[in-house]
Regions:
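Surface-exposed, interaction-prone regions used to assemble/regulate multi-protein complexes
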Residues: 1-121
Length: 121
């Protein structure tokens, strides 16, 4: 996740797929990378998603920073809340995407993130 070329990529869309409710909730990010290529990131086995998106602004949502962290306050608090009911908590990761255009952010607490190539789109 940290190895993607995030700075100046564009966050095109965020899709929350709950068709397999509670078993494998998925968050899908549609990204245009600085190279112009489009990519889809699938966050699988999502346990929580915190989205603070500012809408109504007529411009693309440029990514300022994106990173994986163990120290996010919301993530630490969430893990404390579910430690006794979540049997795979040690596999849980926190992914944060921050935008520069609107000051928005997305935090995804998930077990796994995979890239779906543009060939699959």
């Amino acid at each position: 996740f940290d190895n993607f070329d995030w700075h100046d990529s564009i966050l095109n869309s965020v899709i929350i797929n709950r068709q397999n409710l509670g078993l494998n909730d998925v968050v899908e990010l549609d990204i245009t990378w600085p190279s112009g290529e489009r990519g889809i990131l699938l966050f699988k086995n999502v346990r929580k998603c915190v989205i603070n998106l500012n809408s109504g602004i007529d411009t693309k949502d440029w990514v300022y920073n994106a990173y994986e962290t163990e120290d996010d306050e919301d993530f630490v608090s969430y893990k404390k809340q579910v430690v006794n009911i979540c049997n795979d908590i040690d596999k849980l990761k926190c992914f944060v995407i921050e935008t520069s255009t609107t000051g928005s952010f997305v935090k995804i607490f998930a077990i796994q993130v995979v890239e779906r190539s543009s060939i699959d789109l």
